[in-house]
Amino acid sequence: SLKDFKHFLDEAETRGMEVALDIAFQCAPDHPWVKKHPRWFCWRPDGTVQYAENPPKKYQDILPINFESDDWKNLWDELKSVFEYWIKQGVKVFRVDNPHTKSMEFWRWCILNIKAKHPEVIFLAEAFTRPKRKYFLAKSGFTHGYTYFTWRNTATELQQYVEELTQSESKEYFWPNFCPNTPDNLHADLQTGNRATFIGRYVLADTLTTNAG
């Protein structure tokens, strides 16, 4: 219940922790929006769902949102209200799922409006994508973004990557997050590694950035 959730927030705060909510803008087939606003979703010409694919995965059980719908203004307002609702409940951190597969114009508009009223709110982009796409998300307002740190393993790879993040133009707008919380996207060493492997990786992340974890 919402009462339980608020208690959870309070308990986390007493322990010096911040609760982050995962925001995934997509819907189940039985969501009220599907019947009330069918134009908000992606459909094939034959009327079937134009579901997302990330080979070999096929997400056939969820409906992707059409950010360029002819009713986009109402859609965008409704999506923004999701953030506003949880901010009202006391949430200040959002980890956004796959933002690079959504409209960049939406993120720029949404985050700008949210931060105008709530500048303390943090947006983390869970984006495993091309560097330019990551940087575009940062320029669109995301506070932090996922990186390729997990896949840089040799001393040379790590040095080159950290130099790229700290000595190139991107340092002006991209704040990297070095430890992703997506288990199925970990490097092979971490997928099969023991406790010492993870501790070593975290110490390295904590040494190289102010935003690890």
What are these model-predicted stretches?
Residues 19-21:
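Carbohydrate-binding surfaces in secreted/extracellular proteins
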Residues 23-25:
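Active-site beta->alpha N-cap acidic-glycine motif
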Residues 1-10, 14-17, 27-213:
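Alpha-amylase-like alpha-glycosidases and glucanotransferases acting on alpha-linked glucans and related
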